[in-house]
Every structure is written in C-alpha cells, then in structure tokens.
C-alpha cells in the first residue's frame, strides 16, 4: 500500500514522502496513529494544503520534546524486583514499568515511547531508549535491584557478581573468626584444668633447719 507520511518515521521516510508499506502495517499502525494517509489524489491535495501547518506543528512538538529530552537524557530510575542470588528476576521489567518509573519521578513518558526490544529479566543497570518525538530520542537507565541499598551499590559501579563475591568473602571471614574464638576458648579451658604446682611442706623445711 502507498501512503503519505505525515511525520518522520524511522527506517521509512520523512514527512511528505510517499512510501510503499505492507497493508497490515499501514492499517494497524500508520493510519490509526495518524502517521500517514493513503496515497490517493484527494489526500495528496489535502496534504499540500496542510503542509505548512503540519510542518509548524511538527517544529513546535519537536522543540518541546528537545526541552524534555535535555532533562530526561541520562536519568537513572530505580525499579525494585525480587530475584535469585544469580541475579535472575522472578518476573520481568516491561515498557510499562519503565514508563511508570520515569513518570513517578516527574517525567511524562508514555509506554508507547519506550523502545525495549525484550523485557528485562536480570538485575543490573540497563540502558533503554525513549522516543519523545520522531526526531528526538534519548537514553535512560533502569537500575533494577532487590532493595534500595543494592540499587545504590549498583549505581556506584558494582555488579551483582561483585556484590555476591563480597557477601561470600564476608561470610567466610565471619566463619574464620568464629573458629578462632572457639580455639581461643579451648586454650583457656586447658589452662584452667592444668594441675596447680606443688607447694613445699613447711614442717619438712623446719626439720631440715634443726638438723
């Protein structure tokens, strides 16, 4: 199907271009989202009449998106999820979760603007693209952790593997200290059980002096 693009569409074309697309793509996405019109004589004439207005509207919305993008770009949002010791989530983080996390921090982000190839299924910091306008894209970070404390550690640059290694090392240190304490206590008990040194009999000493 031939359509007239009413705005820039990634990997397809710029505003005003007539492009050929699959009918399903046009019917299910481009036309209902008002990103394109059927390329017929009437619509071509209508587009030419509205072209100046469409370009002005596009410029205004792009400026708004750029202003928001300057604030949103590089922001990190924390999402708390349950996960195994290996870092695998019990569930996943979706585009809806990403949009809600950003919105909760005061940014107006619709889930349709979040470009996530597949749901996130592991702890860690994940980079996600947000498309604010056909010509404005920014990256944000999702800090997926099991607790706010873990999120802070991840934000400082530590991975889930680093955290697990530190916890294991701490556990081994505590066990070693426990055995040291037990060993020290055993030595004290041995000292208490040792027989007292024999004391000289005063009477025998007196007898020796008389002789």
Swiss-Prot record:
What Pfam families does this protein's entry cite?
A: Ribosomal_L9_C, Ribosomal_L9_N
- Where do the record's region annotations for Disordered lie? 180-211
GO BP annotation list:
translation
Question: Which InterPro entries does the entry mention?
Answer: Ribosomal_bL9 (IPR000244), Ribosomal_bL9/RNase_H1_N (IPR009027), Ribosomal_bL9_bac/chp (IPR020594), Ribosomal_bL9_C (IPR020069), Ribosomal_bL9_C_sf (IPR036791), Ribosomal_bL9_N (IPR020070), Ribosomal_bL9_N_sf (IPR036935)
One GO CC annotation: ribosome
Alphabetically, the GO molecular function entries are:
rRNA binding; structural constituent of ribosome
Keywords attached to this Swiss-Prot or TrEMBL record, sorted alphabetically, are: Ribonucleoprotein, Ribosomal protein, RNA-binding, rRNA-binding
Could you tell me what this protein does? Binds to the 23S rRNA.
Question: What HAMAP family does this protein's entry cite?
Answer: Ribosomal_bL9
Give the record's family classification: Belongs to the bacterial ribosomal protein bL9 family.
Protein name in UniProt: Large ribosomal subunit protein bL9
């Amino acid at each position: 199907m031939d359509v007239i693009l009413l705005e820039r569409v990634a990997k397809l074309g710029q505003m005003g271009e007539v492009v050929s697309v699959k009918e399903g793509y046009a019917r299910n996405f481009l036309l209902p989202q008002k990103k394109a019109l059927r390329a017929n004589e009437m619509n071509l004439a209508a587009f030419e009449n509205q072209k100046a207005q469409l370009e002005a509207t596009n410029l205004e919305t792009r400026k708004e998106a750029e202003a928001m993008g300057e604030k949103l770009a590089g922001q990190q949002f924390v999402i708390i999820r349950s996960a195994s010791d290996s870092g695998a989530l019990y569930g996943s983080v979706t585009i809806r979760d990403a949009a809600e996390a950003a919105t909760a921090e005061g940014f107006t982000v619709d889930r349709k603007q979040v470009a996530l190839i597949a749901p996130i299924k592991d702890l860690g910091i994940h980079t996600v693209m947000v498309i604010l306008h056909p010509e404005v894209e920014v990256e944000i970070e999702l800090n997926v952790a099991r607790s706010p404390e873990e999120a802070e550690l991840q934000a400082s640059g530590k991975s889930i593997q680093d955290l697990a290694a530190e916890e294991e090392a701490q556990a081994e240190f505590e066990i070693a200290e426990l055995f040291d304490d037990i060993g020290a206590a055993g030595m004290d008990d041995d000292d208490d059980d040792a027989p007292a040194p024999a004391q000289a009999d005063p009477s025998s000493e007196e007898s020796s002096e008389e002789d």
